[in-house]
């Protein structure tokens, strides 16, 4: 399971070191794609396969489903680690997530997310303000 928050610097070639705890969970090959809130989602292959099955079973007659699936899959790329434990993030994904030098890597149970440090800070500030309201809504869902 992925959890925690780490900050690492991305080099000029778009490579970033993934924390050792996350590397062992991700395995040899994994998938990175556009996420929500202008971050990147990174899935181990077994989680990607489950998600792929769910998304490809959505009705193509649904405009929202088509739009989401196109956006999600067209940005997806299979990744692997180099000898230094780094991944190379393609330029289109770096641009989407506005990744600069400092990148925040967070663990979210079945995936990791890569955030620009600036965007993550802004997200935390806004989420903190509504955290209690969100917690109450989660309670209404039985969580």
Swiss-Prot record:
InterPro entries: MraZ, MraZ_C, MraZ_dom, MraZ_N, MraZ_sf, SpoVT-AbrB_dom, SpoVT-AbrB_sf
Residue ranges constituting the SpoVT-AbrB domain according to the UniProt record: 5-47, 76-119
GO cellular component: cytoplasm; nucleoid
GO biological process, one term: negative regulation of DNA-templated transcription initiation
GO molecular function per UniProt: DNA-binding transcription factor activity; transcription cis-regulatory region binding
Record has Calcium as a keyword: no
Compartments, as annotated in UniProt: Cytoplasm, Nucleoid
Main location: cytoplasm
Protein name per its UniProtKB record: Transcriptional regulator MraZ
Phylogenetic classification of the source organism: Bacteria, Bacillati, Bacillota, Clostridia, Halanaerobiales
Name of the coding gene: mraZ
């Amino acid at each position: 399971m992925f959890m925690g928050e780490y900050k690492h610097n991305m080099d000029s070639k778009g490579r970033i070191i993934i924390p050792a705890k996350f590397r062992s969970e991700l395995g040899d090959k994994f998938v990175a794609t556009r996420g929500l809130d202008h971050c990147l989602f990174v899935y181990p292959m077994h989680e990607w396969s489950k998600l792929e099955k769910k998304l490809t079973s959505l009705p193509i007659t649904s405009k929202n489903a088509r739009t989401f699936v196109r956006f999600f899959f067209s940005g997806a790329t299979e990744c692997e680690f180099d000898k230094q434990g780094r991944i190379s993030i393609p330029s289109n994904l770096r641009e989407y997530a506005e990744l600069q030098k400092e990148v925040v890597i967070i663990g979210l149970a079945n995936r990791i997310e890569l955030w620009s440090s600036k965007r993550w800070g802004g997200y935390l500030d806004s989420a903190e303000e509504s955290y209690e309201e969100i917690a109450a809504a989660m309670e209404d869902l039985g969580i």
